[in-house]
Amino acid sequence: MSIFTFIKEASKNISQVGAVCSSSKFLAKKLTDPVDFSGKKVIVEFGAGNGSVTRMILKKMGPDSILYSFEINPVFMEKLKTINDPRLVLINDSVEDIMKYVKKHEVDYVISCLPLANFNRTFKESILSHVNTALKPGNLFIQFQYSLKDRKLLKHFFKKVNLKFTLLNVPPAFVYVCKDFTQHSH
């Protein structure tokens, strides 16, 4: 996908896309570095966009693992369909419907590229509640943002929130690595 197509889609609905450029390979690396890819894993990606993070996950994943990638933008979904990998399951649906596609506590990792800062608090809490249901206890929710706006919300939902940063993205980005849901999240 060309940069111009990405910008065109982003400008149509910036609150949905949340970015002006696709994620850099450096950001994709930061998002996937905390993941233990050994063995059979079930990984969920929220907001697959044009597939830059999707490709990095697939590159690192084992042959028996599966990646469920959610994307609601039809242009991005068409681009994602060009990725020919039997481990990839593309889902053109809201992330709130994750439980239609996975079993309770089946997911090893959730990697989110959703523009949380653009969503209202109720929707964010709904997303995190569904992540709590889908994620195996003790496993990771990894989210990137361009600001620290939702740090407090994530700390409310998770006992451990580690923050990483990369300048090598346009714009530079924060990566939250979250573990162990709190009692408040139930």
Question: What is each residue range found by the language model?
Answer:
Residues 125-137:
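A short glycine-rich, Lys/Arg-flanked "PGG" loop and its adjoining helix->strand segment in the class I
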Residues 51-55:
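Glycine-rich SAM-binding Motif I of class I
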Residues 137-145:
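Conserved beta-strand signature within the Rossmann-like core of class I S-adenosyl-L-methionine
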